[in-house]
A protein has these predicted regions:
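Non-catalytic cap/lid and distal C-terminal segments of serine-dependent acyl enzymes
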Residues: 1-376
Protein backbone atom coordinates (compact mmCIF):
# COMPACT_ATOMS: atom_id res chain seq x y z
CA UNK A 1 0.00 0.00 0.00
CA UNK A 2 1.24 3.48 -0.85
CA UNK A 3 2.17 5.90 1.90
CA UNK A 4 -0.62 8.31 0.96
CA UNK A 5 -3.32 5.75 0.15
CA UNK A 6 -6.64 5.69 1.99
CA UNK A 7 -6.21 1.97 2.69
CA UNK A 8 -3.12 2.39 4.81
CA UNK A 9 -4.62 5.28 6.79
CA UNK A 10 -7.75 3.22 7.48
CA UNK A 11 -5.68 0.15 8.38
CA UNK A 12 -3.58 2.15 10.84
CA UNK A 13 -6.69 3.66 12.45
CA UNK A 14 -8.34 0.24 12.79
CA UNK A 15 -5.14 -1.22 14.29
CA UNK A 16 -5.01 1.60 16.85
CA UNK A 17 -8.65 1.06 17.85
CA UNK A 18 -8.20 -2.72 18.14
CA UNK A 19 -5.08 -2.41 20.26
CA UNK A 20 -6.82 0.12 22.50
CA UNK A 21 -9.72 -2.31 22.96
CA UNK A 22 -7.34 -5.19 23.69
CA UNK A 23 -5.52 -3.04 26.25
CA UNK A 24 -8.78 -2.26 28.07
CA UNK A 25 -9.77 -5.95 28.00
CA UNK A 26 -6.42 -7.26 29.28
CA UNK A 27 -5.72 -4.51 31.81
CA UNK A 28 -7.41 -6.30 34.78
CA UNK A 29 -5.32 -9.39 34.09
CA UNK A 30 -2.15 -7.29 34.18
CA UNK A 31 -3.03 -5.53 37.43
CA UNK A 32 -0.94 -7.77 39.66
CA UNK A 33 2.47 -7.06 41.11
CA UNK A 34 5.71 -8.46 39.80
CA UNK A 35 7.94 -7.98 36.78
CA UNK A 36 5.71 -9.70 34.22
CA UNK A 37 2.51 -7.69 34.93
CA UNK A 38 4.46 -4.41 34.98
CA UNK A 39 6.19 -5.19 31.69
CA UNK A 40 2.83 -6.22 30.25
CA UNK A 41 1.23 -2.90 31.21
CA UNK A 42 4.17 -0.91 29.88
CA UNK A 43 4.13 -2.89 26.63
CA UNK A 44 0.39 -2.41 26.12
CA UNK A 45 0.63 1.35 26.78
CA UNK A 46 3.60 1.80 24.46
CA UNK A 47 1.98 -0.30 21.75
CA UNK A 48 -1.28 1.64 21.94
CA UNK A 49 0.47 5.01 21.89
CA UNK A 50 2.67 3.96 18.98
CA UNK A 51 -0.24 2.81 16.82
CA UNK A 52 -2.20 6.00 17.59
CA UNK A 53 0.86 8.09 16.72
CA UNK A 54 1.36 6.22 13.45
CA UNK A 55 -2.32 6.57 12.51
CA UNK A 56 -2.32 10.32 13.15
CA UNK A 57 1.02 10.68 11.36
CA UNK A 58 -0.24 8.88 8.26
CA UNK A 59 -3.41 10.97 8.24
CA UNK A 60 -1.44 14.22 8.60
CA UNK A 61 0.94 13.19 5.84
CA UNK A 62 -1.95 12.34 3.52
CA UNK A 63 -3.62 15.68 4.27
CA UNK A 64 -0.57 17.93 4.05
CA UNK A 65 1.63 16.08 1.61
CA UNK A 66 4.92 15.95 3.50
CA UNK A 67 6.10 12.72 1.85
CA UNK A 68 4.76 11.08 -1.30
CA UNK A 69 6.10 7.56 -0.91
CA UNK A 70 7.89 5.20 1.45
CA UNK A 71 11.16 6.00 -0.31
CA UNK A 72 10.55 9.70 0.30
CA UNK A 73 9.92 9.03 3.99
CA UNK A 74 13.02 6.90 4.56
CA UNK A 75 15.28 8.90 2.25
CA UNK A 76 15.95 6.02 -0.12
CA UNK A 77 14.60 7.76 -3.24
CA UNK A 78 17.82 9.03 -4.77
CA UNK A 79 17.10 8.92 -8.49
CA UNK A 80 18.09 12.36 -9.90
CA UNK A 81 15.27 12.46 -12.46
CA UNK A 82 15.27 10.75 -15.84
CA UNK A 83 17.91 11.66 -18.40
CA UNK A 84 16.36 12.39 -21.78
CA UNK A 85 17.93 11.13 -25.00
CA UNK A 86 18.05 14.33 -27.06
CA UNK A 87 18.23 12.41 -30.31
CA UNK A 88 15.03 10.49 -29.71
CA UNK A 89 12.06 11.99 -31.57
CA UNK A 90 8.57 12.07 -30.17
CA UNK A 91 6.37 13.93 -27.79
CA UNK A 92 7.73 15.52 -24.63
CA UNK A 93 4.46 14.95 -22.74
CA UNK A 94 3.19 11.41 -22.21
CA UNK A 95 -0.22 10.87 -20.61
CA UNK A 96 -0.20 7.92 -18.19
CA UNK A 97 -3.57 8.29 -16.43
CA UNK A 98 -6.79 10.31 -16.49
CA UNK A 99 -9.24 11.02 -13.69
CA UNK A 100 -12.48 12.88 -13.12
CA UNK A 101 -12.82 16.00 -11.00
CA UNK A 102 -14.64 15.53 -7.69
CA UNK A 103 -17.47 18.00 -8.43
CA UNK A 104 -21.07 17.71 -9.63
CA UNK A 105 -21.07 16.29 -13.15
CA UNK A 106 -17.43 15.33 -12.76
CA UNK A 107 -17.72 12.30 -15.05
CA UNK A 108 -18.22 14.59 -18.07
CA UNK A 109 -15.14 16.55 -19.23
CA UNK A 110 -17.40 19.16 -20.85
CA UNK A 111 -18.98 19.82 -17.45
CA UNK A 112 -16.08 19.51 -15.02
CA UNK A 113 -12.93 19.20 -17.10
CA UNK A 114 -10.38 16.43 -16.64
CA UNK A 115 -7.17 15.76 -14.76
CA UNK A 116 -4.40 13.99 -16.66
CA UNK A 117 -1.31 12.48 -15.07
CA UNK A 118 1.62 12.99 -17.41
CA UNK A 119 5.35 12.64 -17.63
CA UNK A 120 7.11 15.74 -18.95
CA UNK A 121 10.51 15.38 -20.59
CA UNK A 122 12.95 18.27 -20.73
CA UNK A 123 15.36 18.10 -23.68
CA UNK A 124 17.35 21.16 -22.58
CA UNK A 125 17.63 20.36 -18.87
CA UNK A 126 17.87 16.60 -19.28
CA UNK A 127 15.19 16.16 -16.59
CA UNK A 128 11.87 14.33 -16.77
CA UNK A 129 9.23 14.60 -14.08
CA UNK A 130 5.60 13.58 -13.45
CA UNK A 131 2.85 16.18 -13.24
CA UNK A 132 -0.93 16.45 -13.04
CA UNK A 133 -2.59 18.68 -15.63
CA UNK A 134 -6.08 20.05 -15.11
CA UNK A 135 -7.93 20.83 -18.34
CA UNK A 136 -11.02 23.02 -17.72
CA UNK A 137 -14.40 22.02 -19.19
CA UNK A 138 -14.13 24.75 -21.81
CA UNK A 139 -11.15 22.91 -23.26
CA UNK A 140 -13.52 20.11 -24.38
CA UNK A 141 -16.40 22.24 -25.67
CA UNK A 142 -16.81 22.69 -29.43
CA UNK A 143 -17.14 26.47 -29.22
CA UNK A 144 -13.62 26.66 -27.72
CA UNK A 145 -12.05 24.23 -30.19
CA UNK A 146 -9.85 26.91 -31.77
CA UNK A 147 -9.02 28.73 -28.55
CA UNK A 148 -5.57 28.80 -26.96
CA UNK A 149 -5.72 28.76 -23.17
CA UNK A 150 -3.50 30.47 -20.59
CA UNK A 151 -1.70 28.17 -18.18
CA UNK A 152 -0.39 28.26 -14.64
CA UNK A 153 2.38 26.17 -13.15
CA UNK A 154 1.30 25.19 -9.61
CA UNK A 155 4.04 24.10 -7.19
CA UNK A 156 3.97 22.42 -3.79
CA UNK A 157 6.39 23.09 -0.98
CA UNK A 158 9.30 20.80 -0.09
CA UNK A 159 9.14 17.83 -0.08
CA UNK A 160 5.42 17.96 -0.88
CA UNK A 161 3.23 15.69 -2.99
CA UNK A 162 1.48 16.70 -6.17
CA UNK A 163 -1.69 14.95 -4.96
CA UNK A 164 -1.87 17.49 -2.12
CA UNK A 165 -2.51 20.23 -4.69
CA UNK A 166 -5.61 18.31 -5.79
CA UNK A 167 -6.88 16.73 -2.57
CA UNK A 168 -5.55 19.22 -0.01
CA UNK A 169 -5.42 22.71 -1.53
CA UNK A 170 -8.00 21.77 -4.19
CA UNK A 171 -6.64 23.91 -7.01
CA UNK A 172 -8.71 22.25 -9.79
CA UNK A 173 -11.93 22.39 -7.77
CA UNK A 174 -11.31 26.04 -6.87
CA UNK A 175 -10.54 26.97 -10.47
CA UNK A 176 -13.70 25.20 -11.64
CA UNK A 177 -15.81 27.06 -9.07
CA UNK A 178 -14.31 30.49 -9.87
CA UNK A 179 -14.76 30.06 -13.63
CA UNK A 180 -18.32 28.85 -13.16
CA UNK A 181 -19.05 31.94 -11.04
CA UNK A 182 -17.63 34.22 -13.73
CA UNK A 183 -14.77 35.41 -11.51
CA UNK A 184 -11.93 33.94 -13.54
CA UNK A 185 -11.12 32.87 -17.07
CA UNK A 186 -10.45 29.17 -17.72
CA UNK A 187 -6.87 28.13 -16.97
CA UNK A 188 -4.90 25.00 -17.67
CA UNK A 189 -3.16 24.04 -14.41
CA UNK A 190 0.17 22.19 -14.47
CA UNK A 191 0.57 20.82 -10.93
CA UNK A 192 3.98 19.61 -9.78
CA UNK A 193 6.46 19.26 -6.96
CA UNK A 194 9.48 21.58 -7.15
CA UNK A 195 11.49 18.48 -6.21
CA UNK A 196 12.13 17.13 -9.71
CA UNK A 197 15.53 15.75 -8.67
CA UNK A 198 14.58 13.87 -5.46
CA UNK A 199 15.46 13.72 -2.67
CA UNK A 200 17.42 16.96 -3.05
CA UNK A 201 15.76 20.29 -2.34
CA UNK A 202 17.14 22.32 -5.23
CA UNK A 203 15.04 25.45 -4.58
CA UNK A 204 14.44 25.56 -8.36
CA UNK A 205 18.11 26.38 -9.00
CA UNK A 206 20.34 25.31 -11.87
CA UNK A 207 22.90 23.68 -9.59
CA UNK A 208 26.46 23.93 -10.98
CA UNK A 209 27.42 20.42 -11.97
CA UNK A 210 23.97 19.18 -10.85
CA UNK A 211 20.31 19.18 -11.90
CA UNK A 212 19.18 22.12 -14.05
CA UNK A 213 15.81 22.57 -12.38
CA UNK A 214 15.33 26.24 -13.25
CA UNK A 215 15.93 25.45 -16.91
CA UNK A 216 13.40 22.62 -16.74
CA UNK A 217 10.65 24.87 -15.35
CA UNK A 218 11.35 28.00 -17.41
CA UNK A 219 12.31 26.51 -20.78
CA UNK A 220 11.40 22.85 -21.14
CA UNK A 221 8.04 22.75 -19.39
CA UNK A 222 6.20 25.66 -21.09
CA UNK A 223 7.26 24.47 -24.54
CA UNK A 224 6.44 20.82 -23.88
CA UNK A 225 2.98 21.66 -22.55
CA UNK A 226 2.28 24.13 -25.36
CA UNK A 227 3.31 21.56 -27.96
CA UNK A 228 0.94 18.94 -26.52
CA UNK A 229 -2.05 21.04 -25.42
CA UNK A 230 -3.82 24.14 -26.74
CA UNK A 231 -1.81 26.40 -24.46
CA UNK A 232 0.06 29.57 -25.34
CA UNK A 233 3.85 29.55 -25.25
CA UNK A 234 4.53 33.22 -24.55
CA UNK A 235 5.17 34.77 -21.15
CA UNK A 236 1.82 36.56 -21.15
CA UNK A 237 0.14 33.12 -21.42
CA UNK A 238 1.95 31.68 -18.39
CA UNK A 239 1.87 32.28 -14.66
CA UNK A 240 3.25 30.36 -11.69
CA UNK A 241 1.94 29.93 -8.14
CA UNK A 242 3.24 27.98 -5.17
CA UNK A 243 3.30 27.70 -1.41
CA UNK A 244 6.36 27.80 0.87
CA UNK A 245 9.35 26.60 -1.20
CA UNK A 246 7.07 26.58 -4.23
CA UNK A 247 6.23 30.22 -3.50
CA UNK A 248 9.90 31.19 -3.50
CA UNK A 249 10.35 29.28 -6.75
CA UNK A 250 7.37 31.05 -8.30
CA UNK A 251 8.57 34.56 -7.46
CA UNK A 252 12.18 33.85 -8.37
CA UNK A 253 11.45 32.27 -11.73
CA UNK A 254 9.21 35.15 -12.79
CA UNK A 255 11.77 37.74 -11.64
CA UNK A 256 14.68 35.94 -13.30
CA UNK A 257 12.76 34.82 -16.40
CA UNK A 258 10.10 37.37 -17.36
CA UNK A 259 10.33 35.86 -20.84
CA UNK A 260 8.80 32.66 -19.40
CA UNK A 261 6.28 33.87 -16.78
CA UNK A 262 4.48 37.20 -16.67
CA UNK A 263 2.87 36.72 -13.24
CA UNK A 264 3.75 34.84 -10.07
CA UNK A 265 2.08 34.27 -6.71
CA UNK A 266 4.01 33.14 -3.64
CA UNK A 267 1.96 31.89 -0.69
CA UNK A 268 4.06 32.12 2.49
CA UNK A 269 7.25 32.32 0.42
CA UNK A 270 10.81 32.70 1.54
CA UNK A 271 12.86 35.32 -0.28
CA UNK A 272 16.19 33.52 -0.51
CA UNK A 273 17.30 29.92 -0.85
CA UNK A 274 18.28 28.19 2.39
CA UNK A 275 21.49 26.21 2.56
CA UNK A 276 21.06 23.13 4.73
CA UNK A 277 21.33 19.35 4.72
CA UNK A 278 18.45 18.97 2.24
CA UNK A 279 19.85 21.45 -0.29
CA UNK A 280 23.58 20.95 -0.15
CA UNK A 281 25.67 23.57 -1.94
CA UNK A 282 23.26 24.98 -4.51
CA UNK A 283 25.64 27.53 -5.99
CA UNK A 284 28.97 25.74 -6.30
CA UNK A 285 30.56 28.18 -3.89
CA UNK A 286 29.65 31.15 -6.11
CA UNK A 287 28.62 34.22 -4.10
CA UNK A 288 27.42 35.84 -7.32
CA UNK A 289 24.93 33.03 -8.01
CA UNK A 290 23.77 33.06 -4.40
CA UNK A 291 23.12 36.82 -4.54
CA UNK A 292 21.26 36.52 -7.85
CA UNK A 293 18.87 34.03 -6.24
CA UNK A 294 18.20 36.38 -3.30
CA UNK A 295 14.97 38.20 -4.18
CA UNK A 296 15.62 41.18 -1.89
CA UNK A 297 19.05 41.64 -3.43
CA UNK A 298 17.60 41.46 -6.92
CA UNK A 299 15.16 44.28 -6.18
CA UNK A 300 18.03 46.47 -5.00
CA UNK A 301 20.65 45.65 -7.63
CA UNK A 302 19.08 44.17 -10.78
CA UNK A 303 16.81 45.74 -13.42
CA UNK A 304 13.15 45.49 -12.41
CA UNK A 305 11.40 42.89 -14.62
CA UNK A 306 8.01 43.58 -16.27
CA UNK A 307 6.08 41.06 -14.15
CA UNK A 308 3.18 41.06 -11.69
CA UNK A 309 3.87 39.54 -8.27
CA UNK A 310 1.61 38.48 -5.41
CA UNK A 311 2.88 37.57 -1.94
CA UNK A 312 1.03 36.37 1.14
CA UNK A 313 1.67 36.22 4.87
CA UNK A 314 -0.03 36.56 8.26
CA UNK A 315 0.49 39.21 10.91
CA UNK A 316 0.47 36.51 13.58
CA UNK A 317 1.65 32.96 12.95
CA UNK A 318 3.93 33.35 9.90
CA UNK A 319 7.67 33.84 10.26
CA UNK A 320 7.96 35.59 6.89
CA UNK A 321 5.68 38.53 7.77
CA UNK A 322 8.42 41.15 8.22
CA UNK A 323 10.28 39.98 5.13
CA UNK A 324 7.03 40.11 3.16
CA UNK A 325 6.40 43.70 4.24
CA UNK A 326 9.99 44.59 3.25
CA UNK A 327 9.54 42.94 -0.14
CA UNK A 328 6.27 44.75 -0.81
CA UNK A 329 7.76 48.11 0.20
CA UNK A 330 10.79 47.61 -2.04
CA UNK A 331 8.58 46.93 -5.07
CA UNK A 332 6.36 49.91 -4.22
CA UNK A 333 9.45 52.15 -4.22
CA UNK A 334 10.33 50.79 -7.65
CA UNK A 335 6.78 51.60 -8.81
CA UNK A 336 7.19 55.20 -7.71
CA UNK A 337 10.29 55.42 -9.89
CA UNK A 338 8.30 54.14 -12.86
CA UNK A 339 9.74 50.60 -12.90
CA UNK A 340 7.51 47.90 -14.48
CA UNK A 341 7.32 45.35 -11.62
CA UNK A 342 3.88 45.29 -9.97
CA UNK A 343 3.08 43.97 -6.48
CA UNK A 344 -0.06 42.74 -4.72
CA UNK A 345 -0.43 41.03 -1.36
CA UNK A 346 -2.71 38.92 0.81
CA UNK A 347 -2.10 39.60 4.51
CA UNK A 348 -4.18 37.61 6.98
CA UNK A 349 -4.54 38.66 10.61
CA UNK A 350 -3.66 35.15 11.80
CA UNK A 351 -2.53 31.97 10.10
CA UNK A 352 0.33 29.51 10.33
CA UNK A 353 2.60 27.95 7.76
CA UNK A 354 0.13 25.21 6.87
CA UNK A 355 -2.51 23.98 4.46
CA UNK A 356 -5.38 25.54 6.41
CA UNK A 357 -3.89 28.99 5.85
CA UNK A 358 -3.08 28.39 2.19
CA UNK A 359 -6.59 27.09 1.50
CA UNK A 360 -7.88 30.49 2.64
CA UNK A 361 -5.53 32.22 0.20
CA UNK A 362 -5.77 30.01 -2.89
CA UNK A 363 -9.13 31.33 -4.23
CA UNK A 364 -8.04 34.99 -4.15
CA UNK A 365 -4.57 34.17 -5.45
CA UNK A 366 -5.89 32.03 -8.30
CA UNK A 367 -8.41 34.69 -9.28
CA UNK A 368 -5.62 37.30 -9.22
CA UNK A 369 -3.38 35.12 -11.37
CA UNK A 370 -6.09 34.38 -13.92
CA UNK A 371 -6.75 38.09 -14.30
CA UNK A 372 -3.18 38.77 -15.38
CA UNK A 373 -2.75 36.16 -18.09
CA UNK A 374 -3.76 36.33 -21.73
CA UNK A 375 -4.98 33.55 -24.01
CA UNK A 376 -3.29 34.87 -27.15
Amino acid sequence: MGLTSNNIVIAAAVAALLLFAVTIWLWPRLAGRGVAPVLGRVGMLLGTQLTVFVAFGLFANQSFGFYGSWSDLFGTQDEPGVVVDHDTPGTRVRVTETRHLAVDGGSSPRVAGRIEKVNIQGPVSGIASPAYIYLPPEYFRPEYARRTFPAALVLTGYPGTTEALINGLKYPQTSHRLVKAGRMQPLVLVMMRPTVAPPRDTECVDVPGGPRVETFFTQDLPKAVADHYRVGERARNWGVIGNSTGGYCALKMAMRHPDAFSAAAGLSPSYEAPIDATTGDLFGGSERLERENDLMWRLDHMPAPPVSLLVSSSEHGERNYRDTVRFVNKVKRLNRRGEPTRISSIILSTGGHNFHTWKREVPAALEWLGGRLGDR
